[in-house]
Amino acid sequence: MNPSEMQRKGPPRRWCLQVYPTAPKRQRPSRTGHDDDGGFVEKKRGKCGEKQERSNCYCVCVERSRHRRLHFVMC
């Protein structure tokens, strides 16, 4: 096979690793902008419109494609 035959058809796959702070589900605030310990939580929207909360813990997002994502929460 020559190199031109080995090329994939379609858009290239993009692998991306994003690390951003987020509150675990059990600690998500009932009051907007505050967590249960009185700290401030910043909310924003991701690339695909998902909600991301920033706090003292970390969430690792492994992006496989534009619409498929794997989320791992580490605290």
Curated annotation (Swiss-Prot):
Protein expressed at very low level. Residues 21-43 are annotated as: Disordered. This is Endogenous retrovirus group K member 10 Np9 protein. Keywords: ERV, Nucleus, Transposable element. It comes from the Eukaryota. One of its GO terms (cellular component) is nucleus. Its main location: nucleus. Residues 32-43 have a biased composition (Basic and acidic residues). It is found in: Nucleus. May possess a function in tumorigenesis.
